[in-house]
A protein has these predicted regions:
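Outer-membrane pore/translocation modules
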Residues: 1-96, 138-141, 190, 210
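Outer membrane beta-barrel transmembrane domains
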Residues: 85-209
Length: 210
């Protein structure tokens, strides 16, 4: 569901992580995981003009319930031959992001005559969390996750982002990592070939910049 005048979007979907598609030596699961998920996004551009720069903020988030296709995993100790059974927990997976759009600020609120590079930036803070909620016998009931502050540069045909990955507790990790992303807009770069939709008619390109 989309409500353009109020800059609101709601979406329901299902995420599937297929089991048996990786090496077990590096921790790949033999079972699949199905996660029904609810997504939302809200821009603040519909606020009164008197709120000024606040209207360039946007909030997104998702909440899902992770369900393994197998309730437990059995393994055999190669030395003793003993069979151990480990439960596969169900998790609540959720996250959010808060971002500030410099392109929106310039085009819809006020042009501060900033350098062009700055006008393409979107500072962002993302957070992702996982909480065990069922079938977690014998394991700690601890929420894990990360908080990821960063920035995205948005162009007409691609965007580049970089974020720090900060664990929220020791169970989530002991060091700070870095995540980098390059996102190509194939529908704008190749609108008549690989950027075409499989079904239906392509919408006119919506380039944020000339």
């Amino acid at each position: 569901m989309k409500d353009a005048p109020h800059e609101l979007a709601l979406l329901a979907g299902v995420v599937v992580e297929w089991g048996g598609t990786g090496a077990q030596q590096v921790g790949a699961d033999r079972f699949s995981t199905i996660t029904p998920t609810f997504y939302f996004g809200k821009g603040f551009g519909d606020l009164p003009d008197s709120t000024g720069w606040i209207r360039a903020f946007a909030l997104t988030g998702q909440v899902g319930y992770s369900i393994p296709t197998s309730s437990s995993t059995s393994s055999v100790d190669p030395d003793t031959g003993l069979v151990s059974v480990t439960p596969n927990p169900r998790f609540l997976v959720y996250g959010t992001s808060l971002q500030y759009s410099m392109p929106y600020l310039k085009s819809n609120i006020v042009d501060l005559q900033l350098p062009d590079f700055i006008n393409h930036l979107i500072p962002i803070v993302e957070a992702q969390f996982t909480t065990p909620v069922a079938n977690n016998f014998g394991m700690p009931w601890v929420t894990t996750g990360t908080v990821n502050p960063g920035v995205i540069w948005v162009g007409a045909y691609f965007q580049v982002g970089v974020e720090a990955i900060v664990p929220i507790n020791r169970a989530s990790g002991t060091g700070v990592g870095v995540l980098a992303q390059l996102h190509l807009y194939l529908d704008d770069m190749f609108p008549t070939t690989i950027g075409k939709p499989l079904f239906g008619t392509a919408a006119p390109p919506q380039k944020p910049f000339p």
